[in-house]
From Swiss-Prot:
Chain segments annotated as transmembrane: none
Keywords linked to the UniProt accession: Toxin-antitoxin system
Name of this chain's protein: Putative antitoxin VapB7
Family: Belongs to the UPF0165 family.
Top-level taxonomic group: Archaea
Name of the gene this protein is made from: vapB7
SUPFAM superfamilies per UniProt: AF2212/PG0164-like
Pfam families: AF2212-like (PF01954)
Described function: Possibly the antitoxin component of a type II toxin-antitoxin (TA) system. Its cognate toxin is VapC7 (Potential).
Source organism: Archaeoglobus fulgidus (strain ATCC 49558 / DSM 4304 / JCM 9628 / NBRC 100126 / VC-16)
Length: 65
């Protein structure tokens, strides 16, 4: 069954941010996706920081206009 986990890429290695139930040396497929911030910032031509701030405001019910 497919499972989605978050990982960080450091020194050429993907490191999972949570425990994974895999045997040592087991092969998996990794699908890379842009974060919402990266994809929206590229479309809107605004900084990642401004997009992050707007998403935080929306999450907390603040008016972004």
């Amino acid at each position: 069954m497919p499972k989605v986990i978050e990982a960080v890429y450091e020194n050429g290695v993907f490191k999972p941010l949570q425990k994974v139930d895999l045997k040592e040396g087991e092969k998996v497929k990794v699908e890379l996706k842009e974060s919402v911030v990266e994809s929206v910032a590229g479309i809107l031509k605004v900084s990642d920081e401004k997009v992050k701030k707007a998403l935080e405001m929306i999450e907390y019910g603040e008016d972004i206009y």
